């Protein structure tokens, strides 16, 4: 069974992941017209959790995320940024961040209620 501390770590890591994914998408969008720029992509959150789970020394709250170059199709100028994909990635990151913060907030509310304090 997942403990409350583990739950906080997972959703804290999910919020950090979403922020990193948003940052990567923003950088890709900002450099969309730069000749030769290769878009970057963040590993999936599932892959991150699997990697961190397999390493007993790794903490999901402090472990870094792997960012790699995208292998998408190249434009004639050597750039491979897809604005449509980046907008989708950005919206997905926003959704993940909102979910993580919502669950985190509700968990804190439950803990406060359990110890007899109101928010």
For the regions a protein language model found, what residue spans apply to each?
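Amphipathic alpha-helical polymerization modules
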Residues: 1-119
């Amino acid at each position: 069974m997942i403990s409350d501390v583990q739950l906080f770590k997972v959703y804290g890591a999910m919020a950090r992941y979403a922020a990193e994914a948003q940052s990567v998408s923003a950088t890709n969008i900002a450099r969309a017209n730069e000749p030769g720029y290769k878009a970057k992509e963040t590993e999936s959150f599932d892959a991150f959790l699997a990697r961190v789970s397999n390493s007993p020394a790794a903490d999901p709250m402090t472990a870094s995320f792997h960012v790699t170059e995208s292998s998408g199709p190249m434009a004639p100028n050597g750039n491979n940024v897809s604005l449509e994909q980046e907008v989708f990635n950005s919206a997905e990151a926003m959704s993940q961040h909102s979910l993580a913060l919502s669950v985190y907030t509700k968990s804190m509310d439950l803990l406060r209620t359990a110890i007899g304090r109101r928010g």
